[in-house]
């Protein structure tokens, strides 16, 4: 049975949601450490110091601050990302004059992923804003930048809406787009290139779970090495906007370089690299297997 575009989009969306869930459940503690170290590099000497201080100050739950919005963010982002990825693959086929069922090259898949990420950024930005603020709430309060308040998802959402209205949820959108669009070119490019390496002449669809996870991890490494400084700037903009200071991408970049040096743009890189392999490996494993399961069910039906 040949699926219509609506059914195919629904399958890609559902598989993307499964991948996003797996990604968060696998890598959330490392993401929390990353955001803390990006936003307050002077407070932590490194990953181990950040972990120990977080545990002593807030307990084990401190590693999972922002998990609810992170789940929402990743499910929303990856649902839209993979749904649009399938659509953008068709657009690339039309642009280069290929048949609708033709296999794309690794470079063409990378371009499709880059285009798709622009749509995903629109749903990711609001939820990631809430996540980043929750993850750094303790540091913001103890440093005196904001008054002590209730640290829940709902309280953060209400505060953003009260201060800035609906558009307040898009603090850091330009830096999010600047991270996502080039970043996902390397993400999907690295993933597809790695899958081609493991397939070595066979179909990529025949790859087992270990090559899939390694390919996903390699894609994640490629993404973060390419755009990590932009992610650091984005975290600063989204967290420090709590104080009412609205600084843009360029001003934030210049301020970090002038006051802290260029190395500050790489604060938190270690937990990000550690997280990249298991989290992105789990993402693609869940995506590929759930998508294959649904496609098989559709063909049988």
Curated annotation (Swiss-Prot):
Inhibited by pyridoxal 5'-phosphate as well as by mercurials (mersalyl, p-chloromercuribenzene sulfonate, and mercuric chloride), N-ethylmaleimide and spermine. SUPFAM superfamilies: Mitochondrial carrier (SSF103506). GO terms for biological process: L-arginine transmembrane transport; L-lysine transmembrane transport. It is a multi-pass membrane protein. It comes from the Eukaryota. It is found in: Mitochondrion inner membrane; Mitochondrion membrane. Keywords: Antiport, Membrane, Mitochondrion, Mitochondrion inner membrane, Repeat, Transmembrane, Transmembrane helix, Transport. It catalyses: L-citrulline(in) + L-ornithine(out) + H(+)(in) = L-citrulline(out) + L-ornithine(in) + H(+)(out); L-ornithine(in) + L-arginine(out) = L-ornithine(out) + L-arginine(in); L-ornithine(out) + L-lysine(in) = L-ornithine(in) + L-lysine(out); L-lysine(out) + H(+)(in) = L-lysine(in) + H(+)(out). Gene3D superfamilies: Mitochondrial carrier domain (1.50.40.10). Solcar repeats lie at residues 7-91, 104-197, 207-293. Mitochondrial ornithine-citrulline antiporter. Catalyzes the exchange between cytosolic ornithine and mitochondrial citrulline plus an H(+), the proton compensates the positive charge of ornithine thus leading to an electroneutral transport. Plays a crucial role in the urea cycle, by connecting the cytosolic and the intramitochondrial reactions of the urea cycle. Lysine and arginine are also transported by the antiport mechanism. In addition, catalyzes an electroneutral exchange of ornithine or lysine for H(+), a reaction driven by the pH gradient across the inner membrane. This is Mitochondrial ornithine transporter 1. It comes from Mus musculus (Mouse). The gene is Slc25a15.
């Amino acid at each position: 049975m040949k699926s219509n575009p609506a059914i195919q989009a629904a399958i890609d969306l559902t598989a993307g949601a499964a991948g996003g869930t797996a990604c968060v459940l696998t890598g959330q503690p490392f993401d929390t450490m990353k955001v803390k170290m990006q936003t307050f590099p002077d407070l932590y000497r490194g990953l181990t110091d950040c972990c120990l201080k977080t545990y002593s100050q807030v307990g084990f739950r401190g590693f999972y601050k922002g998990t609810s919005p992170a789940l929402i963010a990743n499910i929303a982002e990856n649902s839209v990302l993979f749904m649009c990825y399938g659509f953008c693959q068709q657009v690339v086929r039309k642009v280069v004059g290929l048949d609708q069922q033709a296999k794309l090259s690794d470079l063409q898949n990378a371009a499709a992923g880059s285009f798709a990420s622009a749509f995903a950024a629109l749903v990711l930005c609001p939820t990631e804003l809430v996540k980043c603020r929750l993850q750094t709430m303790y540091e913001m309060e103890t440093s005196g930048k904001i008054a002590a308040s209730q640290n829940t998802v709902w309280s953060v959402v209400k505060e953003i809406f009260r201060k800035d209205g609906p558009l307040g949820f898009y603090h850091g959108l330009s830096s999010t787009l600047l991270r996502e669009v080039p970043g996902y070119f390397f993400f999907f490019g690295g993933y597809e290139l790695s899958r081609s390496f493991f397939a070595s002449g066979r179909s990529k669809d025949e790859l087992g779970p270990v090559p899939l996870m390694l390919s996903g991890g390699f894609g994640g490494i490629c993404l973060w090495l390419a755009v990590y400084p932009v992610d650091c700037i984005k975290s600063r903009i989204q967290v420090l906007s709590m104080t009412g200071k609205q600084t843009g991408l360029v001003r934030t970049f210049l301020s970090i370089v002038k006051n802290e040096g260029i190395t500050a743009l790489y604060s938190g890189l270690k937990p990000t690299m550690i997280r990249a392999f298991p989290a992105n490996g789990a993402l693609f494993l869940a995506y590929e297997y759930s998508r294959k399961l649904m496609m098989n069910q559709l063909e049988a039906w």
